[in-house]
Amino acid sequence: MSIVINNIGLLVTNDPSVGTDELGQIRNAAVVICGDRIAWVGPSAQAPAADHQSDMAGACVIPGFVDSHSHPVFAGDRSDEFDARMNGQRYEAGGILRTVRRTREAPMGFLDAVMTGILDEMARSGTTTVEAKTGYGLDVETEVKLARVASSHTDEVTFLGAHVVAPECQPDEYVRLVCGEMLHAVRPYVRWIDVFCETGAFDPDQTLEILRAGTDAGLGLRLHAAQLGPSEVIPQACELGLAAVDHCTFLSDEDIDALKATGTVATLLPAAEFSTKQPYPDARRLFDAGVTVALATDCNPGTAFTSSIPFCLAIAVREMGMTPEQALWSATAGGAAALHRDDVGVVKPGARADLVSLAAPSWLHLMYRPGVPLIDRVCKAGRFLRLDQPRLRLDG
């Protein structure tokens, strides 16, 4: 079955071979979808016939957002920590263990309901591809439970057993557990492995050991680094074949050179800095150096509890030195690059049919009018979603 989506006032394709700029913008456009894939893109007047039609009434249409960094499987509410930070308390990474305790106690059905609620929020915000991390179990049983829940919702599941050291373990003992029994147990459910390399979590040697174990298990590599301070691990980790380094607030020139030389994506997470009152990363410095940049939510219960890419777009252009064009690209095609995907974050023949129409004449309004619900319709894999108001419950 095919459908032609026509009368698109302004279409962003992220395909520079069409349109007039890097965003591949086309005015008065149409898109033909066959099944879950895009079959044709071009001017409305030239659109081929299809079985069905959908009239966008002149709306602006963009690719679905690609959120390449999120932590949506957990239990428990940490709003009190946000309140403490807003009252002057300094952010440290210790709150993760509060979520671990609640998550270990939660049944799988409850965790699935939490993730479903967050994904519904994301869909209402225009997100159609989500990377989801484990990391709130820190024992074999719970990490497997989190991986199973996440894998029932997305193909982009990341094993983050190396979030912090489990409270019942010594650091070296826990690294052995992560690299051995835990990794083996979660392997059927995950595509990626990630490590939180920061003071209070894992040091560079431990980080490299865990990443190498992930490589041996056939997983793609991701890294949290340079969020709380400079990191020594990034150049060495990039040589292992990282897909992305995430946070990237405190990067050295050597770090940026390594990202560029290895084609590693720098994923920026402005909602984390917004919530923790930490300095924002300098996105312009990365773009000027030719590094590929992604923009994601870091949706998590402690330091960035937002599911909204549009919110992150607004922060990125105001606080991080991104142009609006760079921000939109980073939240779509950039996120796809961070996941080594070429079938999402773009509107072109062969790509998955993920489209978002806006209740605005231009995508610029996503940043120009922050906080306004401008997402009108969302098409994911060729199906228009029903955007019900999600009901998120964090405590059983």
UniProtKB/Swiss-Prot annotation:
Enzyme Commission number: 3.5.2.7
A Pfam family per the record: Amidohydro_1
Cofactor(s) demanded: Zn(2+); Fe(3+)
Textual note on the cofactor: Binds 1 zinc or iron ion per subunit.
Binding site for Fe(3+): 69, 71, 224, 298
UniProt-listed Gene3D superfamilies: Metal-dependent hydrolases (3.20.20.140), Urease, subunit C, domain 1 (2.30.40.10)
Residues that coordinate or bind N-formimidoyl-L-glutamate: 136, 300, 302
Residues noted as binding Zn(2+) in the record, renumbered to the chain: 69, 71, 224, 298
Pathway linked to the protein: Amino-acid degradation; L-histidine degradation into L-glutamate; N-formimidoyl-L-glutamate from L-histidine: step 3/3
Catalytic activity: 4-imidazolone-5-propanoate + H2O = N-formimidoyl-L-glutamate
InterPro entries found in the cross-reference section: Amidohydro-rel, HutI, Metal-dep_hydrolase_composite, Metal_Hydrolase
The entry's keywords: Cytoplasm, Histidine metabolism, Hydrolase, Iron, Metal-binding, Zinc
Cellular component, GO annotation: cytoplasm
GO molecular function list: imidazolonepropionase activity; iron ion binding; zinc ion binding
Localization annotation: Cytoplasm
Binding locations of 4-imidazolone-5-propanoate: 78, 136, 163, 227, 303
GO biological process: L-histidine catabolic process to glutamate and formamide; L-histidine catabolic process to glutamate and formate
Family: Belongs to the metallo-dependent hydrolases superfamily. HutI family.
NCBIfam families found in the cross-reference section: hutI
Function noted in UniProt: Catalyzes the hydrolytic cleavage of the carbon-nitrogen bond in imidazolone-5-propanoate to yield N-formimidoyl-L-glutamate. It is the third step in the universal histidine degradation pathway.
Protein name per its UniProtKB record: Imidazolonepropionase
Lineage: Bacteria, Bacillati, Actinomycetota, Actinomycetes, Propionibacteriales
Gene: hutI
